[in-house]
Amino acid sequence: MHKIPKGTALAFDFGEARIGVAQGDAELGLSHPLATVTGGSNDEKFAAIAKLVQEWQPRYFVVGLPVHADGTEHEMTHLSRKFGRRLNGRFNLPVYWVDERLSSVCAESLLSEAQVLGKKRKSVLDQVAAQAILHGFLEGGPAECFNGREG
């Protein structure tokens, strides 16, 4: 269990094509889906993220780390870590990485219960996965912090 930072957080479900974003606050005990970032280049994606950072003024980021069922890392794990390091480098905010193994399953379940179907489901799936990642973090699940220094 980790100490939950105070203030607003932005959480990310990173993918090469789409990045789901959620916003939340531990003190309020709330989190909600926010946006799905798409775009061709990393610069376009980070420009969209910069607008969200400006609007929500987060104190930290939470990034989901995809791993195999046995906990071992793979290519997307490394890309997610790289994304988190870029967030830290661009915005100078700490990044907490959390295991996202069940976030997509949780998101699918929530959307099924809410009867969100078709194109609408696809458009919000990554956002709801980011919300699940953030919810797990705010509930005190395991996390690893990166603040610009390896080690």
Swiss-Prot record:
Q: Which GO terms describe its cellular component?
A: cytosol
CDD domains per UniProt: YqgF
Q: Where is this protein found?
A: Cytoplasm
- One example GO MF annotation: nuclease activity
Q: Name the UniProt key words of this record, in alphabetical order.
A: Cytoplasm, Hydrolase, Nuclease, Ribosome biogenesis
The broad enzyme category this protein falls into is hydrolase
Q: Which GO terms describe its biological process?
A: rRNA 5'-end processing
Query: Is 4Fe-4S among this UniProt entry's keywords?
Result: no
Q: What is its EC number?
A: 3.1.-.-
Extract the Gene3D superfamilies matched here. Answer: YqgF/RNase H-like domain
Q: Which InterPro entries match?
A: RNaseH-like_sf (IPR012337), YqgF (IPR005227), YqgF/RNaseH-like_dom (IPR006641), YqgF/RNaseH-like_dom_sf (IPR037027)
The protein's matches in PANTHER family, at most eight in alphabetical order, are given as:
POLYNUCLEOTIDYL TRANSFERASE, RIBONUCLEASE H-LIKE SUPERFAMILY PROTEIN
Which family is this protein grouped under? Belongs to the YqgF nuclease family.
The record's section on HAMAP family has: Nuclease_YqgF
| UniProt function note | Could be a nuclease involved in processing of the 5'-end of pre-16S rRNA.
Q: What's the protein name?
A: Putative pre-16S rRNA nuclease
